[in-house]
Amino acid sequence: MALWGGRFSQAADTRFKQFNDSLRFDYRLAEQDIVGSIGWSKALVSVGILTAEEQAKLEVALLALKAEVEADPEQILRSDAEDIHSWVEGKLIERVGDLGKKLHTGRSRNDQVATDLKLWCKQQGNLLLDSIHGLQTKLVATARQYQTTVLPGYTHLQRAQPVTFSHWALAYVEMLDRDYSRLQDALKRLNTSPLGSGALAGTAYAIDRQVLALDLGFDRATRNSLDSVSDRDHVIELMSSAALSMIHLSRFAEDLIFYASGEAGFIELSDKVTSGSSLMPQKKNPDALELIRGKTGRVAGALNGMLMTLKALPLAYNKDMQEDKEGLFDALDTWHDCLDMAQLVLEDLKVNEPVTKAAAMGGYSNATELADYLVAKGIPFREAHHIVGEAVVYAITQQKPLEDLSVAEFKQFNAVIADDVYPILSLESTLAKRQALGGVCAEQIAFALQQAEQHLSTRHK
């Protein structure tokens, strides 16, 4: 039976009921709805609606229902209840009779669902923090494993300057650290309780909402009932955090897809995260990474959909807000799955170090070193840049790397070039010169690893 039927003389059309009902997705809020109901029952004791004995009886029944839901959440979907609130109330009345009908006194589904959703977001957010931390930890371990492995660095997908595989992995640790911080900030902002805001104007009972908020694990109660029941900023913030983090994961996936390609051959992905072709027996496809990349659009699309749903909604609650859950649930589930899959990809990843080193030495990636050499000889950088560009063109025509040109050949471009140029052009010199904070010299890589390991080991959620 619907919770609102008294006003109506006709039953809802079955097509409308199917269109309107939300149990098929908001059943995921069952545990939070029960927890919120227990908190509300305690508040009703404080204003004389329930006796302590009645509250205790309700709490026992609700806790038993919660245990059943935890064991078999799918049971909820076998009901024809309109939503999770109706289902919980119906089950409660089955167990305790008319006493269960007193629980909703002073409460609206508007503040109830807002509370349920925030409780769910807090729970899921903490799980996501753990997953981000786990991936960061795996990236740092990978960086430690390949601390001295040279890798070509790219701009415009063209070889630019040599870096290390460690430096590459630590770049994603930095991105994920921002993701972690953003998610933490979002969780701090949403940690306010709307329960007791009623439908829109506040409850008519003198409930201490601050005590109620603390009892439910929130930092404080919300301050404005109109805003409380219509606020979905936390949904947008969590979906935005998910979308931006998925962009980072997509970049991670794309890098590794390229590195694993036959054209690069830098890494070998484990059989555990790849698949084959039904036609071509030689294929080893990076499906895990491609799915991470593909699912990024799904999460970004969910965010855009939610932004449009909330656009121009008048205060306070509107049924449009029922659309907040499916996109949020899917976005956070997808984000969580992709974080875990990225970690799995790294578990047995192998780097082909001879290939990465040879690639790092190719593509005239030491051209900037030659320009810096000329600057040290007193030539302005812009002029040095032009000279080196001409030297590179010449080396390409001769099918030689810069370091194989003779001094005589170098002097065609500028007379100051001498034998002391060759140590400057070596791969080792190129890496060693990047000594500023955040650079790729051995000392900076070691420092960055130590800092990352310390940061992750001492982090608190």
UniProtKB/Swiss-Prot annotation:
Q: In which pathway does it act?
A: Amino-acid biosynthesis; L-arginine biosynthesis; L-arginine from L-ornithine and carbamoyl phosphate: step 3/3
Q: Which reaction does it catalyse?
A: 2-(N(omega)-L-arginino)succinate = fumarate + L-arginine
Q: Name one GO cellular component term.
A: cytosol
Intrachain disulfide bonds: none
Q: Which Pfam families match?
A: ASL_C2, Lyase_1
> EC number(s) for this protein?
4.3.2.1
Instruction: Give GO terms for biological process.
Output: arginine biosynthetic process via ornithine; L-arginine biosynthetic process
Instruction: Name the family the entry cites.
Output: Belongs to the lyase 1 family. Argininosuccinate lyase subfamily.
What PANTHER family does the record point to?
ARGININOSUCCINATE LYASE
Give the protein's recorded name. Answer: Argininosuccinate lyase
Source species: Tolumonas auensis (strain DSM 9187 / NBRC 110442 / TA 4)
